[in-house]
Design a protein with these regions (language model features):
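Short beta-strand scaffold positions
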Residues: 37, 104-105
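Membrane-proximal helix-turn-helix segments that form the acceptor-binding/catalytic region
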Residues: 53, 83-102
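Carbohydrate-associated surface elements
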Residues: 109, 130
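A short helix/loop element that forms part of the nucleotide-sugar donor recognition site in Leloir-type
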Residues: 137-154
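Conserved donor-binding/catalytic core segment of Leloir-type glycosyltransferases
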Residues: 144, 154-171, 177-180
């Protein structure tokens, strides 16, 4: 494990140095066939340095559409700053994607966005993460359970909307709420 500093403001993200002699020594001793990086920062940079130095292929999982998070580094909410930040993010994403031997993305939407950014990567693999949507299909609805919850919480005459996820601006929860006002 590479030492890091927890950043509470970023949901407990741990920032670490981009290089560790001890970590490099351990990777060299372990002699992996592939290095899998799952972040563009800190430990991800270290993984890429180790892969380059030890001539090991890199597989990179692109988890986050960073352009959706530009507001976190644009506290003045400037359109110009946002445009510049998004261009930088696109360039970084393109560089990282083009410099690995395999790229894993969570959706075809992400894959299409990265190709739009200019990735030349031929080894892009879509591996969905997150919810098993079929579990929430209407065909799997448990009417007895639904009815018991409606009765338990006295919801017979109420419209109920459920959101499962982290509450953050990029989730656009207010868009749903505003749209429901118009229905």
């Amino acid at each position: 494990r590479v030492p890091g500093l927890e950043i509470q403001a970023l949901y407990g993200y741990r920032a670490c140095n981009i290089f560790s002699f001890k970590g490099m020594k351990e990777i060299k001793r372990f002699n992996p066939e592939v290095i899998h990086v799952q972040t563009e920062f800190g430990i991800g940079i270290f993984g890429r340095i180790a892969a380059e130095y030890l001539d090991i292929p890199v597989v990179y999982t692109y988890h986050t559409m960073w352009t959706d998070y530009s507001h976190y580094i644009n506290p003045i909410n400037s359109e110009t700053v946002d445009t510049v930040v998004k261009k930088v993010i696109t360039k970084i994403s393109k560089f990282y994607g083009n410099s690995c031997q395999g790229l894993i993305v969570p959706s075809n939407k992400t894959k299409d966005a990265l190709i739009h950014y200019g990735l030349k990567q031929k080894n892009i693999y879509t591996i969905p993460t997150g919810l098993e949507l079929e579990r929430f299909s209407v065909k799997n609805k448990n009417n007895e359970l639904c009815q018991s919850l409606i009765e338990k919480y006295h919801l017979q005459n109420h419209f109920v909307l459920t959101f499962l996820g982290r509450i953050a601006p990029e989730k656009s929860i207010t868009v749903i709420i505003d749209a429901l006002k118009k229905v």
